[in-house]
Structure formats: structure tokens, C-alpha cells
């Protein structure tokens, strides 16, 4: 079941453009949104949630345009950004009253349960929280108003490896413990996304390169390092992308062509991204 449909999203700035961005999110899936800095991930997420006005295009959430959602329907969307957009002087525990009056579906028991499990001191002010604690606080908010769609923009920034692992487990449980749920998450730490994501969406310079299941990426692509001499003699039809290395070439190819290459390795999502952005075609 498709919970989110983004169709031909366009947004033009002076030095950047989202160009006909289209993809979909299905129930029961976690989508890794991958691209280099400045590729359009944050702009896309803001466009999905109505935080910026689009030049053209449409976004459907739970079957309705984001511009037609009621206040209660909007609560089905949990959106977190890298920074907390709340007054720094407010204490963590006092924010519960604000959220309770803001969200019809606010569950303070869930909220304080997350704060307790995250070891967040509720007597502290927002400005007194570390970057990692702010990241945890952000996700606690998103998971406490009965959202079924999570849009997470670099939510693991500032978390140490143990906390990131806990965070990944939390997101996996969010999908497993409920029906009709989906997650779109961006992160520059692609190895973390590979632990939990079922699918990947690649974006570069404001354009979607590909949307594909992780299993297909894992099982269909290989990377090879060859000498300059070997590169000159390779059948060009068997190369998807290539890039220069020191006195050699790195190659991305289909696994079905592995018999033609020596010392092949499976290409992961990060490899695929690097080849798509920095690599060249023959």
C-alpha cells in the first residue's frame, strides 16, 4: 500500500533546482534517502511536508494532498530536522504541556517513556541538552502523536555509535509494531541506513537517480579495481560506471558479468552512490 506519493516536484532557487522529483513510499518499508550535501534531500523533505511552497508538483500523504489535510490528519506525519525549532530557554518537561495542547493525539505516557529510555533529564532546558540528546528529543516528539509516516532529515547527527544502533532498532520496531507505517530517512552515515533500510532513493543535483530495493542493489552489482592496462582491454558494454584511482580504475558492473572480472566485490549502497555521482559512463 502506497502511503506517500511524490509526483514531479519542482522548486527553483537562485543556485539550486529540484527537477521533477518523483518517488513513492509503501507501507512496511524504510527508505534511505541518499545524496551528497546540497543534492536536495532537505529541500525535498520540506516540500513533502508543506514547509516550502512548490513551483509545481503534488504530494499525497495517506491518499490526500498535503494541502488538504486536516490538523488531525497532519498529525499522522512525523517530521524531524537536524535542529530543534523550539525556544532554547524552555525546559523539556514543560514542553509536554505545549505539545498536549497542540496535538489532538498527543500521548504523554509515550513521550515520557521515550525520554526515560533515552536518559534525557526533563528538568534541563533545551539549550542545555547535548547535540545527541537533542536528536533523541526530536525523535521522541515525532513518535508521540500517533504518526504513521516518519520523515527524518539527518536524525542521527550527533549520536555516538551505540546510540545510533539503538536509534536504528527503534525505527525497525516502529515498522514492526504497527500497521500502515513507513519511514523516509536521510543520513550521511550510509552504513547505518544499510542496517535497517529496505529500499533506497538516490538524489543528485536535484534529480532522482534511482529508487530501488536494497536486496536488488545488494545482489545485482559488483565493484572491481583494475589496472590501467586491464581497463583499456575491458569490454565497455560490461561497465556501468567507472572512476579513476591511483594508477588504476574502479568499475561498477552487473553481477551477471562477474565471470569477466577477477577480484570482484559486492557493491553496497554507498558504493552505488559514489559511482553514480563521481563516476563516468563510457
Spans of features found by a protein language model:
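Helix-to-loop junction immediately C-terminal to a conserved catalytic motif
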Residues: 49
Amino acid at each position: 500500500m502506497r502511503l506517500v506519493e511524490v509526483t514531479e516536484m519542482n522548486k527553483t532557487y537562485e543556485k539550486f533546482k529540484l527537477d521533477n522529483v518523483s518517488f513513492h513510499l509503501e507501507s512496511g518499508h524504510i527508505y534511505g534517502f541518499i545524496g551528497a550535501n546540497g543534492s536536495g534531500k532537505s529541500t525535498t523533505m520540506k516540500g513533502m511536508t508543506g514547509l516550502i511552497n512548490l513551483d509545481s508538483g503534488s504530494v499525497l500523504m495517506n491518499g490526500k494532498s498535503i494541502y488538504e489535510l486536516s490538523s488531525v490528519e497532519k498529525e499522522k506525519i512525523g517530521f524531524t530536522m537536524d535542529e530543534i525549532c523550539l525556544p532554547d530557554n524552555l525546559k523539556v518537561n514543560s514542553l509536554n504541556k505545549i505539545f498536549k495542547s497542540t496535538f489532538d493525539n498527543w500521548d504523554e505516557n509515550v513521550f515520557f517513556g521515550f525520554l526515560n529510555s533515552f536518559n534525557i533529564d526533563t528538568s534541563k532546558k533545551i539549550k542545555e541538552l547535548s547535540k545527541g540528546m537533542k536528536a533523541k528529543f526530536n525523535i521522541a516528539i515525532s513518535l508521540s502523536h500517533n504518526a504513521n509516516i516518519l520523515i527524518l532529515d539527518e536524525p542521527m547527527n550527533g549520536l555516538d555509535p551505540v546510540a545510533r544502533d539503538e536509534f536504528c532498532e527503534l525505527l525497525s520496531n516502529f515498522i514492526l509494531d504497527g500497521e500502515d507505517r513507513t519511514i523516509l530517512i536521510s543520513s550521511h552515515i550510509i552504513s547505518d541506513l544499510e542496517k535497517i533500510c529496505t529500499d533506497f532513493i538516490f538524489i543528485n543535483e536535484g534529480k532522482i537517480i534511482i529508487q530501488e530495493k536494497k536486496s536488488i542493489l545488494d545482489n545485482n552489482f559488483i565493484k572491481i579495481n583494475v589496472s590501467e592496462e586491464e581497463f583499456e582491454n575491458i569490454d565497455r558494454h560490461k561497465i556501468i560506471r567507472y572512476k579513476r584511482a591511483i594508477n588504476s580504475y574502479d568499475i561498477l558492473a552487473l553481477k551477471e558479468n562477474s565471470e569477466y572480472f577477477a577480484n570482484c566485490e559486492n557493491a553496497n549502497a554507498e558504493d552505488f552512490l559514489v559511482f553514480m555521482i563521481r563516476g563516468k559512463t563510457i
